[in-house]
Amino acid sequence: MISLRDIVEKLFNSEDLNYKESYQLFDYFIKGQIELPLQTSILIALKLKQETSTEIAAAVEALLDNTKEFPKINGDLAGIVGTGGDGFNTINISTTAAIVAAAAGYKVAKHGGRSVSSKSGSFDLLESFGVNIELSPQQTKECLELYNLGFLFAPFYSEGFRYIKEARTILKTRTIFNILGPLINPARPNKVVIGVYSKDLILPMAKTLINLGIDRAVVVYGSGLDEVAIHDDTYVAEIQNNQITEYKVSPVDFGIDTYAIKDLEGGLPEHNREIIKQILQGKGKQAHNAAVAVNVAMLMKLYGKDNLKQNTQEILELIKSGKCYQTLQNVISFG
């Protein structure tokens, strides 16, 4: 076993960790074997030197090895998730997109937690709707199979997360745990859209996904947002057959107007709930509908539907029908 002292010494000297060292470090983290002051120092040291794809992949495996097992789902399973930490406090776009994608017929396992650095995390929102976020893995699987949608609350699956919550709250800034969050879904979706908070993270995240054996994915950075943007360009790394293709898309590629980022501003969970309820019931504002639709359209690309304009139009029509709200109601009733 590699000593924590040796690992910390390397980080404080701005040296990259190898796979074994990073795995060991995050095994220490998730088992509560690192004191709070040292936790914060390690997270800052990693951030300052910038995390490598090797460090991230090893950390993912360490955390997944310490999570509750989720029953295998037959067929394709999707994930739509952002790292968080983009600082804009928008409405919960990826969570809404997950619900809409499920209504469109795609099986989606949404993994996440409560807010760390924003006003409303995905599961703060879901709780405000009355979703039971602590269903057993078997119950969540049944919900997924019935309604195409299952919510996996990170602290329920990884009880060790309680050991790192205080450090993340104290720091109130983006850390490697923002990067790890989208990668440690116990349901292990094989088709994922992951938004990152920095353009510099696109390639490391894409390389990590390949290391983890994900067969189809896109990593997106939306000009400041950790999702596909409707205010400006979105930078994309698409993964297929272990190859990474980089490109850029803009609102015109989705056949939508360009909107201001302030049009997506959110607030506390109760405020966001009312906005998202309107979207799902077909009464949402154009900017809100568009933001959700482009993210689902990008997911559809992973299923062989390459026409982003057509995808977006299809989803906008579904949103306007109001049928998406029933999908959420089904999940609430199930719990």
From Swiss-Prot:
Binding annotation for anthranilate 2: 168
Reactions mediated catalytically: N-(5-phospho-beta-D-ribosyl)anthranilate + diphosphate = 5-phospho-alpha-D-ribose 1-diphosphate + anthranilate
Residues at which Mg(2+) 2 binds: 226-227
Protein residues bound to anthranilate 1: 82
Cofactor note: Binds 2 magnesium ions per monomer.
Cofactors named for this entry: Mg(2+)
GO molecular function terms listed in the Swiss-Prot or TrEMBL record: anthranilate phosphoribosyltransferase activity; magnesium ion binding
Annotated binding of 5-phospho-alpha-D-ribose 1-diphosphate, by residue: 82, 85-86, 90, 92-95, 110-118, 122
Keywords of the record: Amino-acid biosynthesis, Aromatic amino acid biosynthesis, Glycosyltransferase, Magnesium, Metal-binding, Transferase, Tryptophan biosynthesis
Enzyme nomenclature, EC number: 2.4.2.18
Single GO cellular component term: cytosol
Tree of life domain: Bacteria
One GO BP annotation of this record: L-tryptophan biosynthetic process
Pathway named in the protein's UniProt entry: Amino-acid biosynthesis; L-tryptophan biosynthesis; L-tryptophan from chorismate: step 2/5
Family to which the UniProt record says this protein belongs: Belongs to the anthranilate phosphoribosyltransferase family.
Quaternary state and interactors: Homodimer.
Protein's name in the database: Anthranilate phosphoribosyltransferase
Organism of origin: Francisella philomiragia subsp. philomiragia (strain ATCC 25017 / CCUG 19701 / FSC 153 / O#319-036)
Top-level taxonomy: Bacteria, Pseudomonadati, Pseudomonadota, Gammaproteobacteria, Thiotrichales
